[in-house]
Amino acid sequence: MQLLKWLSVTDRFYKIYLDKQLAPYGINNSQYMFLIKICRSPGILQDSLLNMFYVHPSNIVRTVATLEKQGMITRSPNDKDKRTCKLYPTERALSIIDEIQMICEKTEALLLQGMSESEQNLFMDFLIQAGRNITSELHIER
């Protein structure tokens, strides 16, 4: 039960911490990863986000709509498939993305504080394996 407890504690408090750091930029812990990906891959298909982030499709639709409403991204129809959209960052998003990336890097450093580089690598390997174990059990393959 200790593993579940500390996964829960870490998840809850890193999100609170990240929300405080991201607040001046008008985004939160559920939006930053989408914004980073869209800024780094302009024209990315909305549907491709599903395979990257292991979230429910409704979360993607809601987050994309919120980012668009906030003036962070624009949507453009996909000429090859009208059922999906291409996503592009706005100038506003591009002007803050480096700071957001830095906040994420500092948050990761905080979480890994006190671990050697080899311990950090092992921790990441173990965390990835745990994630694969649970997604495989739930038959979520990406």
Where are these regions (language model features)?
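N-terminal leader segment of winged-helix/HTH proteins
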Residues: M1-Y25, M72, E141
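Short, locally clustered residues in the helix-turn-helix/winged-helix DNA-binding domain
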Residues: S8, I36-R40, Q101, I128
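Charged, amphipathic alpha-helical coiled-coil/dimerization segments
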Residues: K15, A65-I128
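N-terminal helix-turn-helix DNA-binding core of bacterial DNA-binding proteins
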Residues: I16-N59
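Exposed, interaction-prone assembly regions rather than primary DNA-binding/catalytic cores
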Residues: N121-R142
